[in-house]
Amino acid sequence: YVSATAGTKLSVPLITSADINAPHKQVTIQEIYDFMIKDVKEAIEQGLPEQSRTVIHPNLGAAYAFLARVYLQMANYEEALKYADMALEQNDTLYDWISYYNSHKEAITKEDSYPSLPSATGYDYVENYYFRCGEGNPNYATSELNIPVERAESFEGGDARFLSRWKLRTVNQDTYYQGLAKGYFNGAGLTTCEVYLIKAECLARQVTGNDFSAAMDVLNKVRKTRILPEIYQPLQASTLTEAIDLIRRTKDNELIFTIVPFADARRFNAEGTFARALSKTWEGQTYTLTPASHLWIMPFPAGAVQNPGNGTITQNVSK
């Protein structure tokens, strides 16, 4: 979302009918954002309950959390902060990952042992506003995905959440961090941790001097439930760049395997100030994804463009 072009650049076809033959229109980015916001606000007005029937049914906290996420993507930090606070009024609980790690420490630290631990982030995860499995299957338990060594290096030292979920392993010529957890994973839902980190960024964005303590207090509140006490030190920032970097590190790691780090990266790239190039070396060759690369954009399948049904679809990339 870029406000200067949102009213003219096309997004996706907006389909509001269950009729397979209903006509559709490819709307602008502004129109699709307006539709999402209007839809959620209407649901709130119509009486979304504070407590939903199940965690896979949205409740009031989920609606507020979703609006906070959407407004953050629009760089509307005032509204994002407003709805983040409203979501936290519904649920502000953070999971104690330090206690989880300590409960399973013996199994985790046992040499040459890669135990199957119960996922803490399933349907009953206390941070859930709304649960969706993401890449997992809602009908049966799945295993935590492995991560490469270079990805693991971005986690803070002493991160109990990381230590509880991955363990370094070498098999033949491959060294990687093996996923330990098995169960259900809220990979596409909404959680209190994300909302705290949205709030932290919004508070940082509103600073006019160099006092980022309010934003750092929110970030550190999350970290206190993650970083082992013998290693934990409160983070401080004296510039917006420092604050954003610290918040982004925690958020990228907390929401690994979700769409959020990707969406945030595109948002920061569009803004320019906090844009990053991503590089990876594979078999002696270094590949770099620049902030302006067309590869950040997911093109429509050729079949959809050529046969769009009862409407038209304009391709969103030129390459």
What are these regions (language model features)?
Residues 224-226:
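Flavin (FAD/FMN) cofactor-binding core of flavoprotein oxidoreductases
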Residues 1-53:
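Aromatic-anchored glycine-rich loop motif in surface-exposed flexible loops
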Residues 208-209, 236-238:
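Short, glycine- and charge-enriched coil/turn segments that flank and shape catalytic ligand pockets
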